[in-house]
């Protein structure tokens, strides 16, 4: 037997290298085979419910890192709730209708207008479901637990029926109406868009300054006067029917020197406009308030059949332009509102493809709206005063990335204005984890217009509306519920397969159809109505979930998207918000803080991370960032997170190895019988348990990450485990000192594994497989550890906090001695302490082997005053010299008692007593040489 064999060196097959890319799929298959998700739900039956309702990602392509961050965050929350006494099922979902899928099929060569519509919809459905399957595997590969075999998908018959019923309730309450308001119109997708489908980009446009001649000045202006107008959308002049001024803005009547004409502009802008128009010298003839100009009549710049009325509008400012804007009610919301109030014609001169129509005039007909500027300039002639190119923020179609226009077309609307205050009142009842989120959603609802819910597309849920022979729209409870039942049985494609009369209840009559003839609506619903109905299609209809949901968690863009549409439909139907809490996340940016895009080549695919690092590293990264704001991710950042993971793993490996001979049922030492330092670590660990449990409850992942890493690095690695080897390796295998420390090791190991499970389930299960005395076969079926309190814990914490200060001072003294070449390692030191009474009392109170805690070979507490050469602090001073004696071959301490024993071992007296007591045969035979 060799002397080293008398050491209790930790033994374990738990590998240092995780091998996550290879092992994770193996674990995931084992969980699936064991039906772990279902078993967890069965365990929690009857407990308080917690419903995190999954916002559906769009089913198109593989998931990106933003999807991963969101789904991992949800998984951490659901897992932690499941392990905290809640019944917390998770039903993943997908959004499957809409233009992107139509675009994919178009790129694949499918010609929608040349094939049977039902066949086309079948292709859309098949493609959508193939993408659901693809993303399902992507999410499962992240280790996300949920009811993956029974997700919700917005194209299924049960979901579509639930959506129709949401619409029906809104129709019954009078919230659905048809109007010809201007809406965001995407010529590139030939459809109206909702606000949530708009994104803003910089656009360079031609802006024109031109003048309308006064036709009837109403006794205020002469007919040789011109009102100067500014526009950034020249094509809309073809539909201009008025000029809008600000009632309280001051305007001046001016005449430039050498110019026969007189002009009206905002007084505040005269100087800048004079420079722009080349007016070297201007005479101000008169000043008017805007309200004095009301109802003056001007000529259209070129259409002699059109008069343009001067009207008042609150939206006019003097921030730019001339303080006067032309008003085309068919091409803008503000224009429409003031135009309707003043009985102006709502003219629309651009078709659904962005092409100028016949009513724009023969010179314009057939041109694309963006290309008409030269024609407009030609038509304006000498009425054009200036033109310039400007860059401004402009709305784009979020899917096609093309600019959109405002365009008045007949559409179906949800009248948000009718129940706006109800929605605002409900927002006040919701808990927002970011106060700015509440303000943002509140202001969006407060300021938004009515919701355009119709779309001129085919791949979506049809609007369940019929038309009588006289054109009356029919959307009554009887017909809508009948459609819902048909969809429930056959799916929404039946709408396109059957004639209108076959979609109506048998025997249905209507006074507007004396001949019994009916037509059906051909528009579909906005996809935000699809996902915005999920509270009904899923949360209400799935018995395992509870409505309102406890939590909605999505990206911050969903304040204008899913948070918004869900809120509107839920309040419209039931008068309550669909969620009790909202937690929003920022966007994942690259390592430099730039937006990720394929064109820049700075994207990170979750699959690449899984191959290089493993999903665990991505999961740990999610907790390492403040996801309430935008976050950064790169392979370098993930490499740093991987190092943190390695530190966590190897710390826990040390605990596994050094409890391999510990049977908790037989070897646990009662708390009251622990050493003071062991009690301290037990209490500190329970502080960590409380911090992490509270942070899980508040969804504060970064708090968990910081607290866990700090505990492992500072409390364990830099302190407790730093001197642990002197106990667990050196002392007798069954000695009290070793069992005391193993008791703490095992307690921390088991509980920290449970605490890690929601974040690192693969690693936690791997650790759990080495804990043979734990009864649950999977750690995911266990509960998070409860927070314990202990007698005198505050007193113990105070004592050890003071000792840590003392230890820090001692380490500085040792470092100085090391720098002065007095010692090499700290075990070579003889440390002499010169304490005052406070420190002396402290060292007695810790009731421990202080030399062992400081990892020095010898420690003396001196009674005499410190010498001049001592390193002094306020309460204590230190001197360091090389310890006397020889190095013990067993414990490596320098000890005066170290000597060669009769059994061929050079060891100290302490090690000799351990060896002689525990290894009598080896002592009798003598140890082998090293």
Curated annotation (Swiss-Prot):
Pfam families: Anticodon_1 (PF08264), tRNA-synt_1 (PF00133), zf-FPG_IleRS (PF06827). The keyword Metal-binding applies. GO terms for cellular component: cytosol. Disulfide bonds: none annotated. It catalyses: tRNA(Ile) + L-isoleucine + ATP = L-isoleucyl-tRNA(Ile) + AMP + diphosphate. Transmembrane segments: none annotated. Belongs to the class-I aminoacyl-tRNA synthetase family. IleS type 1 subfamily. This is Isoleucine--tRNA ligase. It comes from Streptococcus pneumoniae serotype 19F (strain G54).
């Amino acid at each position: 037997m060799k002397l080293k064999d008398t050491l209790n060196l930790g033994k374990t097959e738990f590998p240092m290298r995780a091998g996550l890319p290879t092992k994770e799929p193996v674990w995931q298959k084992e969980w699936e085979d064991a039906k772990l998700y279902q078993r967890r739900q069965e365990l929690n039956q009857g407990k308080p419910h917690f419903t995190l309702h999954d916002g559906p990602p769009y089913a198109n392509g593989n998931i990106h890192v933003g999807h991963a961050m969101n789904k991992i965050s949800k998984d951490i929350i659901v897992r932690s709730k499941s392990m905290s006494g809640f019944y917390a099922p998770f039903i993943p979902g997908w959004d499957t209708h809409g233009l992107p899928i139509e675009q994919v099929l178009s790129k694949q060569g499918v010609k929608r207008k040349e094939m049977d519509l039902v066949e086309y919809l079948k292709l859309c459905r098949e493609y959508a479901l193939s993408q659901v399957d693809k993303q399902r595997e992507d999410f499962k590969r992240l280790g996300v637990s949920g009811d993956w075999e029974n997700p919700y998908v917005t194209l299924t018959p049960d979901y579509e029926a639930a959506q129709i019923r949401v619409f029906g309730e809104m129709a019954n309450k009078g919230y659905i109406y048809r109007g010809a308001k201007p809406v965001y119109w995407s010529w590139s997708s030939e459809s109206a868009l909702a606000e949530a489908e708009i994104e803003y980009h910089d656009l360079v446009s031609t802006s024109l300054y031109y003048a309308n001649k006064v036709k009837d000045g109403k006794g205020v202006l002469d007919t040789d006067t011109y009102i100067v107008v500014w526009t950034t959308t020249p094509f809309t002049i073809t539909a201009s029917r008025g000029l809008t001024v600000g009632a309280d803005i001051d305007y001046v009547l001016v005449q430039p020197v050498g110019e026969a004409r007189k002009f009206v502009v905002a007084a505040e802008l005269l100087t800048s406009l004079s420079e722009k128009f080349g007016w070297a010298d201007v005479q101000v003839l008169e000043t008017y308030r805007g309200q004095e100009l009301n109802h003056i009549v001007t000529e259209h710049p070129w259409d002699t059949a059109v008069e343009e009325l001067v009207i008042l509008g609150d939206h006019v400012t003097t921030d730019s332009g001339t303080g006067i804007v032309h008003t085309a009610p068919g091409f803008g919301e503000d224009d429409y509102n003031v135009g309707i109030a003043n009985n102006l014609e709502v003219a629309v001169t651009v078709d659904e493809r962005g092409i100028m129509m016949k009513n724009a005039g023969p010179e314009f007909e057939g041109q694309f709206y963006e290309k008409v500027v030269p024609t407009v300039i030609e038509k304006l002639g000498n009425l054009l005063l200036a033109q310039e190119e400007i860059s401004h923020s402009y709305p784009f179609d979020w899917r096609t990335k093309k600019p959109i226009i405002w365009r008045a077309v007949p559409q179906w609307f949800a009248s948000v204005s009718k129940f706006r205050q109800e929605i605002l009142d409900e927002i006040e009842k919701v808990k927002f984890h970011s106060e700015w989120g509440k303000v943002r959603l509140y202001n969006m609802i407060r300021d938004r217009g009515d919701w355009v819910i119709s779309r001129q597309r085919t791949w979506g849920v049809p609007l369940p509306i019929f038309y009588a022979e006289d054109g009356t729209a029919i959307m009554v409870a009887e017909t809508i519920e009948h459609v819902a039942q048909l969809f429930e049985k056959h799916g929404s494609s039946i709408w396109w397969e059957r004639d209108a009369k076959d979609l109506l209840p048998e025997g249905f009559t209507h006074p507007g159809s004396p001949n019994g003839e009916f037509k059906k609506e051909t528009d579909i619903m906005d996809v935000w109505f699809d996902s915005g109905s999920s509270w009904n299609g899923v949360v209400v209809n799935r018995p395992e979930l509870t409505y309102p949901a406890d939590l909605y968690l999505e990206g911050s863009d969903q304040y204008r998207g899913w948070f918004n549409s869900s809120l509107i439909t839920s309040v419209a139907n039931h008068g309550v918000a669909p969620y009790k809490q909202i937690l929003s996340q920022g966007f994942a940016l690259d390592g430099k803080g730039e937006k990720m895009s394929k064109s820049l080549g700075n994207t990170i695919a979750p699959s690449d991370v899984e191959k290089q690092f493993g999903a665990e590293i991505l999961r740990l990264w999610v907790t390492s960032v403040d996801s309430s704001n935008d976050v950064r991710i790169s392979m370098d950042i993930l490499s740093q997170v991987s190092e943190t993971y390695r530190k966590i793993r190897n710390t826990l490996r040390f605990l596994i190895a050094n409890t391999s001979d510990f049977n908790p049922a037989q070897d646990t030492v009662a708390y009251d019988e622990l050493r003071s330092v062991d009690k301290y670590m037990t209490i500190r660990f329970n502080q960590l348990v409380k911090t992490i449990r509270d942070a899980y409850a508040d969804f504060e992942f970064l708090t968990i990450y910081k607290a866990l890493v700090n505990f492992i690095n500072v409390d364990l690695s830099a302190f407790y485990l730093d001197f642990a080897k002197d106990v667990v390796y050196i002392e007798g295998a069954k000695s009290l000192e070793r069992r005391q420390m193993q008791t703490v090791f095992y307690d921390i190991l088991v509980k920290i594994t449970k605490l890690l499970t929601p974040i690192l389930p693969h690693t936690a299960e791997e650790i759990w497989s080495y804990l043979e005395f734990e009864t649950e076969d999977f750690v995911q079926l266990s509960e998070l550890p409860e927070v314990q309190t202990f007698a005198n814990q505050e007193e113990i914490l105070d004592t050890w906090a003071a000792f840590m200060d003392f230890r820090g001072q001692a380490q500085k003294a040792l470092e100085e001695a090391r720098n002065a070449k007095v010692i090499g390692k700290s075990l070579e030191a003889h440390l002499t302490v010169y304490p005052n009474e406070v420190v002396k009392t402290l060292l007695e109170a810790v009731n421990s082997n202080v030399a062992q805690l400081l990892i020095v070979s010898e420690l003396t507490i001196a009674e005499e005053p410190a010498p001049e050469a001592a390193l002094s602090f306020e309460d204590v001073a230190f001197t360091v010299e090389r310890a006397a004696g020889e190095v013990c071959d067993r414990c490596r301490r320098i000890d005066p008692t170290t000597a060669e024993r009769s059994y061929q071992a050079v060891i100290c007296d302490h090690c000799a007593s351990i060896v002689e007591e525990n290894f009598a045969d080896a002592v009798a035979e003598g140890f082998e040489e090293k």
